[in-house]
């Protein structure tokens, strides 16, 4: 960030816990907790947090019910209805929670949030116009929209957590 790099993506695998979920998650959750804490602290101390957006999420949550069948041994399958994500810095207020699930985390109860809402909010706060055209990575001579019209039409905003 200090060198003007506009975008960094980090892929940290090992979260697909269909088997032995709680045992499997001990290591990556501890590592992620320490890494995100250090990143946010460092960005804040260097005066970069206000101009840097940090987004941490997966593409879905995990089913509320733990599968105790022998072949899964405490696993949890994919679950798109409820999930957790984190955004920080770059125009987002800290310490906020948006949305709420029911008591069993089987359905949303208040203010459903979608991945498209995160995308729309991040693009807006980063000053990216979704109608701009960027080189298509498959055919570098052709240009395509930053966001397809189908995705753009579904993008809400998380304005309740904007600074």
Please state what every model-predicted region is:
Residues 1-163:
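Ligand-binding pockets and gating/stacking loops
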């Amino acid at each position: 960030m200090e060198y003007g790099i506009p975008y960094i993506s980090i892929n940290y695998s090992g979260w697909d816990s269909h088997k032995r979920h709680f045992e499997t998650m001990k290591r990556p959750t501890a590592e992620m907790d320490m890494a995100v804490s250090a990143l946010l602290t460092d960005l804040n101390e260097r005066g970069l947090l206000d101009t840097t957006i940090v987004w941490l999420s997966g593409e879905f949550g995990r089913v509320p019910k733990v599968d105790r069948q022998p072949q899964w041994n405490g696993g949890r399958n994919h679950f798109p209805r409820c999930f957790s994500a984190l955004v920080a810095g770059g125009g987002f207020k800290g310490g906020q929670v948006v949305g709420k699930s029911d008591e069993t985390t089987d359905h949303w109860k208040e203010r459903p949030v979608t991945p498209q809402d995160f995308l729309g909010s991040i693009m807006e706060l980063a000053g990216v116009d979704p109608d701009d055209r960027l080189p298509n990575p498959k055919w570098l001579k052709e240009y395509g929209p930053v966001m397809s019209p189908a995705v753009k039409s579904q993008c809400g905003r998380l304005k309740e957590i904007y600074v």
